[in-house]
Amino acid sequence: MDDVTAARVKAAFRHVNRAMVMLWRLGLGRWVNIWPSGSGRILVIGHTGRRSGLRRWTPLNYASVDGELYCTAGFGATSDWYRNVTAEPRVEVWLPGERWMGVIDEVSDHPERIRLLQAVLVASGFAAPAAGIDPRRLGDEALAAATSSYRLLRIRQVAAAEPLPPHPRPGDRIWWWAAVACGGLFWHARRHQRQHHPQVWQ
């Protein structure tokens, strides 16, 4: 992938990522993961900006292999979230029905890197093919060459040293659905009244 294409793909993923995080906050985390072969298996990590110190949120494709969670930085060392977790590996993790503190370790030199990376790419659904990589068809050597810049990371759950922050969290904006429903009912009631009691609006 050339630099121009990579920049466009990164920009597209940035917009998708924002929408994905909002879906989790709207309580749709389970639905986001309902089609693993298409949209992939997705979790969200909360990480600390290496310069700003602010909390950032990034959805990631992941695979569970031998009881461990693995993800990859497809844009290598240029990924902002990767540079953030390299500087501060402690992260907050959102999974369907779960929320906990964890630590991210880079394991790019793992002896089974290709097997683990292939599992993550298969679990990414359309994302890997969109980047020009078909993990189901490529052999080990071809996959290693195509992903030479990829970083492989492992996420481990740890006991939280401090309480998880109340916001943001999965489902913290689920009340939006009630607001939308109330707005819809109000609009429907006004429309019905205009149709059946037009004199009220004259």
Which residue ranges define each predicted feature?
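N-terminal first-folded block
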Residues: M22-R51, W176-G184
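Short conserved beta-strand and strand-loop elements enriched in small hydrophobics
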Residues: I45-G46, P89-G97
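Short hydrophobic alpha-helical membrane-entry/anchor segments
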Residues: G183-P198
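A short mixed-secondary-structure module that forms the rim of ligand-binding clefts
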Residues: A63-V93
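Extreme N-terminal tail/first-helix region
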Residues: M1-W35
